Amino acid sequence: APLDQESDLTHVTGSGIVVGPRGVVLLEHKRLGIWLQPGGHIDPGETPWDAALRESREETGLEVAFAGPVDGAGVPELMHVDVHEGGRGHIHLDLRYLIDGGVDDPDPPEGESQQIDWFDWDAAIDRADPGLRGILLVLGATHGVGRRE
């Protein structure tokens, strides 16, 4: 099944682009050493957007909620799908949702990346992994903040 982490061909994950008045939350991936948005694999019975919200809450310690439009069935707008090759020959699909992180300082629990903070839009764009940078440029422009490149 595509949502199964052990599936051979396709891994699907859900992640949250966490934004607020302070900018964007980025964290340093513990294994890869790159700066990304919170996210992870989808648990059994979970939707990709449920996973994005749960992972955002777990990895940041923030009270989070969907920031983009949510339809009558409670399904939030899908902001971006990132497609890239995974480490073991599989295709990785990351479904990204816009999440409101409020204004508090991140407080990640033990076991999650401790390298996490709010970055203003320009700093986030500079620091983010290339796969995230493009959507941050678009979001920054549509939110009336950050650069217009």
Question: Predicted regions: what is each one?
Answer:
Residues 20-21:
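A cytosolic small-molecule/anion-sensing beta-strand core signal
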Residues 17, 30-31, 96, 122:
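Anionic group-transfer/hydrolysis microenvironments
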Residues 43-134:
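Unchanged
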Residues 24-54:
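Glycine-rich active-site/cofactor-binding loop and its immediate structural neighborhood
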Residues 6-7, 27, 40, 107-110:
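Short histidine-centered beta-strand/loop micro-motifs
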Residues 1-15:
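Acidic, metal-coordinating catalytic segment for phosphate/diphosphate chemistry
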